[in-house]
């Protein structure tokens, strides 16, 4: 069932991404971008909301991600969970650079609230957020036994991903199609990464919290008793 769901997600994400890329490369105007501009840029922007969106956008910056990696290592003794998340992050960054160089889509002009450089498609922040926090959600789903903690963490990670994507549109540094494409690419990537690469770090059925944990040695008194 898990493999079937993974396949469906990957295929749907691939179809959406290919459609978006086709339209962008053909120079066609996408209605989604116009709708998102009207909704997010025209109607949502408020002086008090702008610093909030800037802070949300920073959840995909290196300093925050490094802190998150340290947290993964702290809460999951043994380095493999943190290394797993770190390798995922590095490979996604490389993939984003490659895709941007292929598409060469300029960033939006005229309504940016912050300065950004580089190409626009797909959104790097959106790709990073989906790949990194998405993998953390996957880890929690597979290895956390407490249902409340599991659903709380997964809801939190999902909210972060959506909020980061929305913040990039709000700040005027990406089109909605950049964000959607970034999400789709990372969903495809996570389907591959969790199937092929994650087992190298976290074998199926292994609790990350138990990785490299030494077995308890009973005391002489307990053996005598």
Say what each PLM segment does:
Residues 17, 21, 49, 95, ...:
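Alpha-helical membrane-inserting segments
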Residues 57-77, 132-134, 140:
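Hydrophobic alpha-helical transmembrane segments
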Residues 83-113:
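Hydrophobic alpha-helical transmembrane segments of integral membrane proteins
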Residues 69, 112-225:
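Membrane-embedded catalytic cores of phosphoryl/pyrophosphoryl-handling enzymes
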Residues 16-20, 91-98, 159-168:
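Aromatic-anchored segments of alpha-helical transmembrane domains
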Residues 1-63, 101-113:
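N-terminal transmembrane-helix/juxtamembrane module of multi-pass inner/ER membrane proteins
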Residues 3-12, 69-93:
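Interfacial segments of alpha-helical transmembrane regions
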Residues 44-56, 88, 92, 112-117, ...:
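Short juxtamembrane and helix-loop transition motifs at transmembrane-helix boundaries
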